[in-house]
Amino acid sequence: FIDHVEEVTDEFAARRPEVAVPVVLRRLPPGYYSTDLGRSLAQFVQRYGDAVDRRTTLIICGDGRNNFNNPRLDLVEFLRRRARRVVWFNPEGERQWGTGDSDMLQYAPAVDAVHQVSNLRQLTEAVDRLFM
């Protein structure tokens, strides 16, 4: 999620997205959240790292803005070595990478591909590229 991993598979498997999203959000404790991608990556590797193998296509969704926290590139590289491929869907264009608290200039070389995905057309194109 923002600073931690949240399992949402069951909610989305059993409900339409417009119902599942509020269910997931209600489950989260109230408060201020500050993006910490490194912490999220560490939790993901700890909980699910063993499930990532050469059959896995890992898709990371987010803008790569990290509030100047440790980006944990070592964990992205670890996942890339284990997975078939690692792809990043980012709503921001490449010109915004590296501005402010964006770590995308560091993350981009550590993954197999980065696709700008800020609308349905771009999402469709990015998903189509996964199957080429």
Predicted feature residues:
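Cofactor-binding loop segments of dinucleotide-utilizing enzymes, especially the Rossmann-like FAD-
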Residues: 1-3, 63, 91
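Von Willebrand factor
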Residues: 1-56, 58, 93, 98-99
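Acidic, Ser/Thr-rich peripheral helices and adjacent loops at domain boundaries
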Residues: 10-31, 106-114
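Alpha-helical scaffolding segments of alpha/beta enzyme cores, especially the outer helices
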Residues: 39, 43, 74-81
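DG-centered beta-turn motif at the end of beta-strands
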Residues: 56-67, 112
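Conserved alpha-helical "signature site"
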Residues: 69-72
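Von Willebrand factor type A / integrin I
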Residues: 77-132
